[in-house]
Amino acid sequence: MAHVKRYRRSSKSSEEGDLDNEDYVPYVPVKERKKQHMIKLGRIVQLVSETAQPKSSSENENEDDSQGAHDVETWGRKYNISLLDQHTELKKIAEAKKLSAVEKQLREEEKIMESIAQQKALMGVAELAKGIQYEQPIKTAWKPPRYIREMSEEEREAVRHELRILVEGETPSPPIRSFREMKFPKGILNGLAAKGIKNPTPIQVQGLPTVLAGRDLIGIAFTGSGKTLVFVLPVIMFALEQEYSLPFERNEGPYGLIICPSRELAKQTHEIIQHYSKHLQACGMPEIRSCLAMGGLPVSEALDVISRGVHIVVATPGRLMDMLDKKILTLDMCRYLCMDEADRMIDMGFEEDVRTIFSFFKGQRQTLLFSATMPKKIQNFARSALVKPVTINVGRAGAASMNVTQQVEYVKQEAKVVYLLDCLQKTAPPVLIFAEKKQDVDCIHEYLLLKGVEAVAIHGGKDQEERSRAVDAYRVGKKDVLVATDVASKGLDFPNVQHVINYDMPDDIENYVHRIGRTGRSNTKGLATTLINKTTEQSVLLDLKHLLIEGKQEVPDFLDELAPETEHQHLDLGDSHGCTYCGGLGHRITECPKLEAVQNKQASNIGRRDYLSNTAADY
């Protein structure tokens, strides 16, 4: 007989009772259920527009009772107030919550900018280690004429206002409206006349007196505004002064260093220095020796000039670091440093290279930074390397030149190359065609040659001799079309370029501004045509759309329809418009694709070994 398990009656009944208690649901009256339903609905609406910081669980428990009552009062039916008054009250509450969302956005942007600003100062390793900080700018012997020194602040501001010059910084120099009043010698004036330059441009009116006075400078002006002369003429004058006081002996120098981001720009800057040096020598003044140090040229050419004593060196970062590492060149005497297109060189990719170059200086120097696109994050970071800098801004940083008519056309990817022939019919030569990829440049070049167009091409994959030959042939007018990657977009000055064609849209809007700035230079008119299609990133198209609106250009329908619902959201917050990181007008820093790419790159480099700086590419 099987054994039957027995249970105690009392324990069984208590277990059943516990189970019954667990399943028990208290009865809630209909009126109370309606009330709770109203609270629930109110909370849903409230959570949608909620922007305050989330509370801890304990705070929520404490506030539940009072919050529930408040929600009933706010969102429930009010019999003693009309529906119109209730609607007005709810609208005010929604507006208040919207304002708090804007404040939250601004607070978030401030945090991002602070995290960027917390990087190491842009100084040499020795200066950072010893905590060296220079408090006063370098003093020079140059002074403006007395009648200009005696101008009142109101008169100076009137000149700046007329020329649309914005100046920031302590006690900036007065603006001077003629080269003769800037006390340039006859040789310089002859050199200016030979190039057909009669009066200074706005950036030169304020920039030249500032640099001649020895002040550190951040110069921002649209492409083709004459920034090069602002740093070339003063360094020639300082070198001349040094040569007069004590002539340079063998292997001495340089006094001035100019760093350029590309070989073509370095070559162009060196040729400008040689032009004015020859005119000075023709007037019986000492020879100013300048040296070009860049990849693709034999080091022996630079060594020849350095061995005789060099006053000015124009260099690209890769070759410069190589020469400094090998002690071919020293910066012991260097007191003048200029970085052309500085935003590119201080940008994340080349920041360490610049810091390495700074560490070779042995004393205080006058530092100048120039570019057409200088976002706030670069300006703030660059100030760590400068002493009481003066910032001169002619037009918004990153704005396109008003002399350029911009046209944007939608063309399918497979039809682009053929469509280039139609674009070439719009204007007379010379024409510049830009493409992102080297293979696209080669493809376009080959197609144009097959169609009988006189074209040349340059990109980073070609050797230096071929690049120089192509640029020279295009510059003197032997060739009608130059096809190039962005290597030709920064700072290069080609005479009378009628038309710039963007075969594709660059990755960021700064490159677009540099590209179209090759035309419409020195108060001439130009045309820029950009071909886009579905492969183009929407964030860049939004930036382009807002750039066209800012420049009062025609916006095509396919761009006008782009993201209309986000048109007004948060683009004008606080003092800034658009993104403070990259300068794009179509987004804020919280959605910046460039910042995101930089952060991803930094994250991917975590844990990797640090490569020696002297192996850096000569970009």
From Swiss-Prot:
GO MF annotation list: ATP binding; ATP hydrolysis activity; helicase activity; mRNA binding; RNA helicase activity; zinc ion binding
Motif DEAD box: where in chain: 340-343
Region (Disordered): 1-25, 50-69
Sites of Phosphoserine modification: 11, 13-14, 56-58, 66
UniProt biased composition (Basic residues): 1-11
Catalyzed reaction equations: ATP + H2O = ADP + phosphate + H(+)
Domain Helicase C-terminal as annotated: residue spans: 403-563
Subcellular location: Nucleus
Predominant location category: nucleus
Helicase ATP-binding domain mapped to chain residues: 208-392
Binding of ATP, residues: 221-228
Motif Q motif mapped to chain: 177-205
Effect of residue 241 to K: In allele 14B; temperature sensitive
Gene Ontology terms: biological process: mRNA splicing, via spliceosome; regulation of gene expression
Signal peptide: none
Keyword Magnesium: no
GO CC terms in record: catalytic step 2 spliceosome; precatalytic spliceosome; spliceosomal complex
Family: Belongs to the DEAD box helicase family. DDX41 subfamily.
Function according to Swiss-Prot or TrEMBL: ATP-dependent RNA helicase. Is essential for the directed and fasciculated early outgrowth of the bolwig nerves, as well as for its navigation at later stages. Is required during post-transcriptional gene expression. Plays a role during morphogenetic process, apoptosis and the establishment of cell polarity.
UniProt-recorded name of the protein: ATP-dependent RNA helicase abstrakt
Source organism of this protein record: Drosophila melanogaster
Lineage of source species: Eukaryota, Metazoa, Ecdysozoa, Arthropoda, Hexapoda
